[in-house]
Amino acid sequence: MANKLFLVSATLAFFFLLTNASIYRTVVEFDEDDATNPAGPFRIPKCRKEFQQAQHLKACQQWLHKQAMQSGSGPSWTLDGEFDFEDDMENPQGPQQRPPLLQQCCNELHQEEPLCVCPTLKGASKAVKQQIQQQGQQQGKLQMVSRIYQTATHLPKVCKIPQVSVCPFQKTMPGPSY
């Protein structure tokens, strides 16, 4: 009797584990290191050319750098944990109320092909991240890098880029490649 009870229990446990395992699905995403990938952030050659012609989105780089260096306790155009641009986007006075540097960045992004907006923003973000690294900014570096990519992620929405609302940059763990 104990043998049958054990066999039934083991069978039920096996089926439970089998059905439970089939419910969950693991998604593995590879974030290639752009430093070792010759294409870098530009999977589309046309985007690399646009990035170079746009002088590497200089105004956007300056805006990203400014946002990275500010703490979360600034005006509404800075980051405070979550993205604060959305409150200002609904300003009925429109884009003329944007800070001039942000407006220049938006102008640069509007000149890009919609397909290239995110790759060029990723290139600009990487350039800013490297600038911060070269400046030797150790204090709060992880937060600065996070603010760079968080700002860049939402810039298409802030700038009202057609066909692009956000750039889905993957968050990567900090490593020696900083």
Curated annotation (Swiss-Prot):
Segment forming the signal sequence:
1-21
Q: Name one GO molecular function term.
A: nutrient reservoir activity
Expressed, tissue-wise, as follows: Cotyledons and the axis.
Pfam families for the chain? Tryp_alpha_amyl
Q: Does the keyword Disulfide bond apply?
A: yes
Keywords, comma-separated and alphabetical? Disulfide bond, Seed storage protein, Signal, Storage protein
Record propeptide residues: 22-38, 75-94
Q: Which InterPro entries match?
A: Bifun_inhib/LTP/seed_sf, Bifunc_inhib/LTP/seed_store, Napin/2SS/CON
Q: Which Gene3D superfamilies match?
A: Plant lipid-transfer and hydrophobic proteins
Q: Which family does it belong to?
A: Belongs to the 2S seed storage albumins family.
Q: How does it assemble?
A: The mature protein consists of a small and a large chain linked by disulfide bonds.
Q: What exactly does this protein do?
A: The small, basic, water-soluble napins are one of the two major kinds of storage proteins synthesized in the seed during its maturation.
Q: What is this protein called?
A: Napin-B
Which organism's genome codes for this protein?
Brassica napus (Rape)
